[in-house]
A protein has these predicted regions:
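Extracellular glycan-modifying ectodomains
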Residues: 1-172
Length: 172
């Protein structure tokens, strides 16, 4: 949000410290390391959930179908290990969140599972937030998606292990 505000004529808002509170899940958290350390010792890192003082109602669509408007899939209990699927319910090729606030920009976030955590807080600054997971989306190229949906802001989110891979994430 700060980078968009500093480098463009588009102005985005994000809740200040008094308007957002983070809750820490007590569960063991694998996070983005899941694919590399499955079954190995957990560290002390904890998953955080953003709670906005003034929640914004929204509609959610996953892969073109209207979905339940949730941001977090709560774990069964405090001891079950949690990972990135807790954010946004996991990976979808395309998620669209509509807040119906025309004064805010339409934003496209593309990348891989790292987008899931960002989506849970980014939507509040958007009229529409589109998220494309390049590993699972194949309906059209990223360029065609941008031409069709005309977002005001486009943000790419990748981890260093995938950005130079010419398959999946790197092919776009």
């Amino acid at each position: 949000v700060d980078a968009v505000n500093a480098n463009s004529n588009i102005k985005m808002d994000f809740p200040t410290d008094g308007e957002i509170e983070y809750t820490e899940y007590p569960n063991p958290y694998l996070g983005s390391r899941n694919r590399k350390i499955i079954g190995q010792k957990y560290n002390d890192e904890k998953l955080l959930k953003a709670n906005f003082k003034n929640d914004v109602p929204f509609e959610r669509f996953n892969d073109g179908k209207k979905s339940v408007p949730v941001l977090y899939i709560e774990p069964e209990n405090d001891t079950v290990p949690v990972s990135y699927p807790l954010y946004m319910g996991g990976d979808f090729g395309n998620t669209v969140i509509k807040t119906h606030r025309d004064s805010l920009p339409n934003v496209l976030i593309y990348g891989a599972s790292f987008t899931n955590a960002i989506e849970t807080v980014a939507y509040i600054s958007c009229n529409e937030m589109h998220s494309v997971d390049m590993r699972h989306y194949g309906d059209m190229s990223l360029l065609d998606y941008v031409k069709k949906n005309k977002p005001d802001v486009v943000v790419g989110v990748f981890d260093w292990s995938n950005i130079s891979d010419l398959n999946d994430d790197g092919k776009f």
